[in-house]
Amino acid sequence: MRNKRVIPNRTFRVSDQIQRDVAELIRDLKDPRIGMVTINSVDITPDYAHAKVYFSVLIGDAADSELALNEAAGFLRNGLFKRLQIHTVPTLHFHFDRTTERAAELSALITQANARRALDSDQ
């Protein structure tokens, strides 16, 4: 029973460490297609074979950044080999995270609904 709680905590710690290390390693990339990228989260498979890295872009094109990051995944994984003290370093798969866009859209919809409600109550 005790091992069942340890494994998820270790996975969370490893994913957090990968998130921090990948963010630092991206700064070393010279690819002009990669704009200002923020690593939002990392999801790792239980066997540490694959990691989905979710990112957002402040400046630059999301599709170009995703392509460039996936092309640089081998370089970034090699950097993780040097930094992490685990037996298997996962293969990195980068995905653009649309959470911030969706949050802005929902916020705008809520604002519009509140404005309509205020207009309806005034009439």
Curated annotation (Swiss-Prot):
Keywords: Cytoplasm, Ribosome biogenesis. Pfam families: RBFA. One of its GO terms (cellular component) is cytosol. One of its GO terms (molecular function) is ribosomal small subunit binding. InterPro entries: KH_dom-like_a/b, RbfA, RbfA_dom_sf. SUPFAM superfamilies: Ribosome-binding factor A, RbfA. Signal peptide: none annotated. This is Ribosome-binding factor A.
